[in-house]
Structures are given as C-alpha cells and as structure tokens.
C-alpha cells in the first residue's frame, strides 16, 4: 500500500505550502474535470516512481482541552497514529517556539517515525538556522523552503528511504492480469459496505455493525466467483483483537485512500436515503485522481419511493457529474438485489482498465478525430498531432506525439478522450491523455551552427 506521510506543526509554519507543492500534479490532473470537489487535506503524490499519500493538518496544539483547537488536535492525533511517518515542520525564520517543544514531546510519545524539517530557510545558512532545533531531540533538522522548493525532494526521498520504499521494479509497474483483481469497497460511514461484502462472498467473514464508522484497518477478503479469484478490500468493517471483532468509533479517511490507491476497481457506495455529501464527493474525487476503474452502487434502494429515487438519480448526475465514465447501480446489499449486474460491471470496468490499445489503431482514431474537428489555432499556428500509442494501463494512458502540443486545450483533450473511449468501448475507467512534443531537429541544428566559430 502507498505509505502515508503526515505534515504537522503549529500554525503558520508553511504546512499547506509544503502540501500544495507536493500535490501540484494532483491539482493539474483534475483541473479539467467539471464539478470535481477536492479534499484539501489529503493528496496522492509521486516522487519519481514512488507514490505516497500526503496529509495536511491544522495548527497543532496537542494539550488543548476545549473548542475548535481541541477538535483539530484530536483529528491530528488520529491521523498521526495512522501515518507511516510524520514530517514535523518548524519555522526557521522565527526560531524555536514553546509550542514546538510541546509538539515534539507528543510526537516522541507516539512512537511514529519523525523527520524534523526547518522551513523558510531560503537565503540563510543552514547550520545557523537549524542550530536551535537540535534540542528537540528528533534527530538532525532538515532545512527546506516550501515556497521555493529548496530541499523538498531530498526531504521526501529521506522519508521514503527510511520506510524502505524502493523504486518499483519493471514488473511492478505493469499490472499483472494473472493476479487476483483487487476491489476496494469505499464510501462514507454506514452506507452498507460490510453488508455488501458479506453478501458477495456469501459468509460472515466481515461482521457488519449498524453504527457509523467501524474500523481503521482495511480488511482484505479473498474469495472466488465463478471460478475466478478476487480480493475484496473493506475499509468500513472492524478491527480484530485475537478472535474478537471490535467496533471502532471513527471512519478512517487514510485507510480509504490507501485502499483506493492499492486496488484495481473501486465500488463507491452511496446511501439512497441520504443526500450526496461533501465527504461522498471527496472520496469520489480521490478515485478519479487515482485513475481507478469505478462502479457506483446506490444502496438501500428498496427502502425509498419513486419520488426519492428520481431525486437521487438527479442528485448523482449533478453533484457527481465528473463520474460520468462509471455505471450507477441501484442495489440492496441486505437483500442482495442488483448485485449480479453490479459484479458484471466490476469485471467489465477491470477489463476496460487493462485493455491493450494497438498503436496503429490509436493513430487512425486520432487522425479521424482531427479530420472531424481540428484543434484551435494558437497564435499563427495550429498544434500538429501526428501519432499515438499506449503509455500505460489501469488507467489506460494514450500518449500523443506532435508539435506545438502545449496549445492543445483541455476541451480538445476531452474530445479526444471521448473518441478513444467510444471506439474501444472503454466503460467504467478513466482514460488519461499525455502530450509529447517532438523536438525540431532543424531548430536544434541551427542552434548548433550559430554556436560554431568560423
């Protein structure tokens, strides 16, 4: 699973600036998805080929007893407990503050790995600006500048190295179709996730509770269906202590995001009896950003009348319109209605996500799309899209080569995406398009000639 790195520190030390720098690719990735709601506190990041989940937290006061500050501290303590490593950010310009010592004391007691990062050190001598922070007893302080990016790559590399997160091998970068498909069942508390898993596997392997938010730990349940192996990942069930299952009081966003990042297909469960919430949209947004194949299950459909059903359909279409690539299934997890069609779509979505797209056919589709509608002119010229090939699976990635491709608009990319998906019948999976502008050998040659002395 993707490791979780949490950024903590007192207010105004630059936590959000660091978070935004680490997740910049995430913002760019989803900018053209109309209506997509993003959770500002959680982001999927990548350094080279190493992926991780980053968590931003509010100003941390671990000893606060009441009010909103205490509630923020409670949330931060929970996410620290679920993290693989913590980056403790302090302000190098203002120097040591009493609150820094309080936070350091708390972090030592948690037993979580901690890297002390001294922010806002641009233009300052590292040995001087970090000197005071040695007394916190959290190892060698790491000087960085979140605003300028100085030292950030080294900081994250050190964090991932300390966790033993290596660059994935060639085989790990390619999805193995011989491995069991891994399905993550996700959704906000009490929508019936564990009930669905119980019904799919036909036994009480995961005990369902009728109380919102029951586990921090994703439980993997291997099973077979029609002779085919699967693994179901439940992020809603319970934690096991020996032979006893114990309900946990709080829904875990971190475990949900890890399960999404680690699976092949996501079943997003919604409650037909409740409005689409901001939390529903946040989870849906992360699924899109992770590029996962998706099927939407609207649970408790049997318990509502025709008017409420129509309203639910309309609300999903409006509030989750960025999920238009996925099929929506009304189900009853308790009674088992609608599950046969749901699982057919799970298989179909996985097949679409793993589809092989031959380069000659991709190029032909590209050329036909251009003949039907050319990209808009940029200045005096027009982007030239010459050929395409597949660049990855799960999700499918189409790499387009040509010249002046920086001028291709987001709307034209969506147009091309639709053409590729229609021809290959890719339903249930996002499709990514990458533009690769070719170098002009004549321009490069001219530059070389100008540099020569006669």
Curated annotation (Swiss-Prot):
InterPro entries: G_ENGA, GTP-bd, GTPase_Der, KH_dom-like, KH_dom-like_a/b, P-loop_NTPase, Small_GTP-bd
Subunit structure: Associates with the 50S ribosomal subunit.
Listed name of the protein: GTPase Der
Domain of life: Bacteria
Residues binding GTP 2: 187-194, 234-238, 299-302
GO biological process: ribosome biogenesis
NCBIfam families: GTPase_EngA, small_GTP
The keyword Transmembrane helix is annotated on this UniProt entry: no
Keywords, ordered alphabetically: GTP-binding, Nucleotide-binding, Repeat, Ribosome biogenesis
Family of this protein: Belongs to the TRAFAC class TrmE-Era-EngA-EngB-Septin-like GTPase superfamily. EngA (Der) GTPase family.
UniProt-listed Gene3D superfamilies: 3.30.300.20, P-loop containing nucleotide triphosphate hydrolases
Domain KH-like: 355-439
A single GO molecular function term of this UniProt record: GTP binding
Residue stretches making up the EngA-type G domain: 3-167, 181-354
SUPFAM superfamilies (UniProt xref): P-loop containing nucleoside triphosphate hydrolases
UniProt-annotated binding residues for GTP 1: 9-16, 56-60, 119-122
Function: GTPase that plays an essential role in the late steps of ribosome biogenesis.
HAMAP family the record matches: GTPase_Der
Organism: Polynucleobacter necessarius subsp. necessarius (strain STIR1)
């Amino acid at each position: 699973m993707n490791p979780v790195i949490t950024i903590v520190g007192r207010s105004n030390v630059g936590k959000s600036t660091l978070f935004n720098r680490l997740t910049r690719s995430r913002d760019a990735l989803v900018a053209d998805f109309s209506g997509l709601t993003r959770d500002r506190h959680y982001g999927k990041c990548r350094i080279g080929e190493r992926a991780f989940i980053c968590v931003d937290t509010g100003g941390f006061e671990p000893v606060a007893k009441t009010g909103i500050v205490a509630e923020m501290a409670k949330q931060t303590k929970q996410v620290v407990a679920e993290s693989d490593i913590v980056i403790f950010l302090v302000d190098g310009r203002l120097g040591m503050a009493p609150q820094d010592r309080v936070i350091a004391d708390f972090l030592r007691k948690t037993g979580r790995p901690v890297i002390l990062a001294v922010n806002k050190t641009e233009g300052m001598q590292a040995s001087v600006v970090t000197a005071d922070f040695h007394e916190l007893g959290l190892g060698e302080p790491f000087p960085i500048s979140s605003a300028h990016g100085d030292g950030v790559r080294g900081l994250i590399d050190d964090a991932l190295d300390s966790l033993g997160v290596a660059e994935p091998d060639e085989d790990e970068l390619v999805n193995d179709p011989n491995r069991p498909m891994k399905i993550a069942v996700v959704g906000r508390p009490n929508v019936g996730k564990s009930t669905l898993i119980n019904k799919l596997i036909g036994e009480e392997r995961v005990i369902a509770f009728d109380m919102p938010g029951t586990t921090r730990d994703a439980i993997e349940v291997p099973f077979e269906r029609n002779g085919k192996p699967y693994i179901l990942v439940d992020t809603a069930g319970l934690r096991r202590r020996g032979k006893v299952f114990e309900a946990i009081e709080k829904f875990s966003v971190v475990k949900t995001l890890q399960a999404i990042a680690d699976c092949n297909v996501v079943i997003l469960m919604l409650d037909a009896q409740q409005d689409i919430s901001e939390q529903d949209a946040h989870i849906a947004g992360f699924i899109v950003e992770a590029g996962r194949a998706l099927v939407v299950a609207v649970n408790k459909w049997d318990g509502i009348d025709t008017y409420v059903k129509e309203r639910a359909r309309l609300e999903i279409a409006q509030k989750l319109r960025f999920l238009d690539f996925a099929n929506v299934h009304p189900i009853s997890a308790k009674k088992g209605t609608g599950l046969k069609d749901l699982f057919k779509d799970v298989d179909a979505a996985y097949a679409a996500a793993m589809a092989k797209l031959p380069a000659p056919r991709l190029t032909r589709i590209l050329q036909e799309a251009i003949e039907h509608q050319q990209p808009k002119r940029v200045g005096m010229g027009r982007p030239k899209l010459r050929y395409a090939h597949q660049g990855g699976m799960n999700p499918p990635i189409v790499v387009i080569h040509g010249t002046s491709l920086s001028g291709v608009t987001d709307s034209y990319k969506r147009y091309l995406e639709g053409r590729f998906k229609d021809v290959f019948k890719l339903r249930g999976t996002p499709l990514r398009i990458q533009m690769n502008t070719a170098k002009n050998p004549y321009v490069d040659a001219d530059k070389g000639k100008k540099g020569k002395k006669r």
